[in-house]
Amino acid sequence: MLIDSHTHCRYSPDSKSDPEDNILAAIDRNIQVLAFTDHVDRVDNALDYVFDFDAYIKELNGLKERYKDKIDILIGCEMGLNPSMNRVIEPAMADDRFDFFIGSMHTLDNQDVASTIRRMTGDFLDYYLHYYEEMFNAVESTKGFHVLGHMDYVDRYLTDKSMIPKFVRYRDIVAAVLKSVIQKNIVVEYNTGGFFRGLPYGNPKDDILKLYRDLGGERICLSSDAHFPAHIGRGFSEAREHLKALGFQHLTYFKNKQPIEVPLK
């Protein structure tokens, strides 16, 4: 069964894709379950972004009905994790019209991670430690999200990938994040977008996936992070084989905020 658990359309600020075009592309690629997960990032400055939930849900429900015999459409959202804004993040994620929420670290100290890391020079270790410490705080304190998105998202945006700190230097804080994820039954996302953003791996990298398995983690979903119809489901054949080789036995997705597990065959 092919499931793409993370895609974007024109309700996100960084996509212009028509939702129906995404659906048609998914059907063409024999994807049985397609999740729309458009961006919401709540920060205390001009980066703050939220879309019209009512319009989004109305449009997607119409498409869901139109294509119900060909594909299962899930209505999700990628919520930017930011513990300082939990007062608005958590009520939004209580909306039961959504099938699920991905929690992702797009900002740190109310600043865009991608822009910040591109400007930085020197040793990035302190930034990495702070990034994962804040991720730990978010997982511990934020209620209502079901999937932890592209954990090592920060890796994508170093201009010189050789400057990514050695994993052993921040392994302990990543382990703390993963232990909390496991305890809270949050699903870890494997996002093939990393392969297409200058990395030789999906997000998260194998160091994190192997640590997750070593700690007893089993729940994982597979996502393209597509912002264009042509990118839906890309890299999935290789990704599925890779996850199986690492010992994962099933994929998890959410419908009506309830987990559904399917064999990873």
Where do the protein language model's features map onto the residues?
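Histidine/acidic residue-rich metal-binding segments in metalloenzymes
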Residues: F53-E65, D72-L74, P91-R97, D123-V147, ...
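An N-terminally biased module of ancient metal coordination in phosphate/nucleic-acid-related enzymes
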Residues: M1-V88, A92-D95, D99, Y157, ...
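Active-site rim beta-loop-alpha module in soluble metabolic enzymes
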Residues: H150-T159, N185
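Surface-exposed cleft-lining segments at the edges of enzyme active sites
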Residues: A114-Y127, D155-K166
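Short connector loops/turns at beta-strand edges and beta->alpha or beta->beta junctions
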Residues: H39, H106-N110, Y153-V154, G217
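Non-cysteine beta-strand/loop elements that form the S-adenosyl-L-methionine
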Residues: L34-T37, F98-T107, V147-M151, E189
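Charged catalytic cores and adjacent phosphate/nucleic-acid-binding surfaces used
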Residues: M1-C9, P19, D109, K161-K265
